[in-house]
Amino acid sequence: RSCIDTIPKSRCTAFQCKHSMKYRLSFCRKTCGTC
């Protein structure tokens, strides 16, 4: 899978992942460009 930076790293928090993005934390980290 390619990693796409969909949200700013500053907003990549556990809360964002669990409540806004509906993804697991590991996937949220990938979408924040930390792959």
From Swiss-Prot:
Keywords: Antibiotic, Antimicrobial, Disulfide bond, Ion channel impairing toxin, Nematocyst, Neurotoxin, Pharmaceutical, Potassium channel impairing toxin, Secreted, Toxin, Voltage-gated potassium channel impairing toxin
SS bond partners: 3-35, 12-28, 17-32
Effect of residue 16 to K: 6.6-fold increase in selectivity for Kv1.3/KCNA3 over Kv1.1/KCNA1, which is marked by a 2.6-fold and 117-fold decrease in potency of inhibition of Kv1.3/KCNA3 and Kv1.1/KCNA1, respectively
Molecular functions per Gene Ontology: potassium channel regulator activity; toxin activity
ShKT domain: residues covered: 3-35
Outcome recorded upon mutating residue 20 to Q/R: More than 25-fold decrease in potency of inhibition of Kv1.3/KCNA3
The family this protein is said to belong to: Belongs to the sea anemone type 1 potassium channel toxin family. Type 1a subfamily.
Role, per record: Peptide with both antimicrobial and neurotoxin activities. Inhibits voltage-dependent potassium channels. Potently blocks Kv1.1/KCNA1 (IC(50)=6.7-87 pM) and Kv1.3/KCNA3 (IC(50)=10-250 pM). Less potently blocks Kv1.4/KCNA4 (IC(50)=0.31 nM), and Kv1.6/KCNA6 (IC(50)=0.16 nM). Shows moderate activity on Kv1.2/KCNA2 (IC(50)=9 nM), Kv1.7/KCNA7 (IC(50)=11.5 nM), and KCa3.1/KCNN4 (Kd=0.03-30 nM). Blocks Kv channels by binding to a shallow vestibule at the outer entrance to the ion conduction pathway and occluding the entrance to the pore.
Miscellaneous note of the record: Negative results: does not show or very weak activity on Kv1.5/KCNA5, Kv3.1/KCNC1, and Kv3.4/KCNC4 (IC(50)>100 nM).
Protein name, entry field: Kappa-stichotoxin-She3a
Taxonomic lineage from the root: Eukaryota, Metazoa, Cnidaria, Anthozoa, Hexacorallia
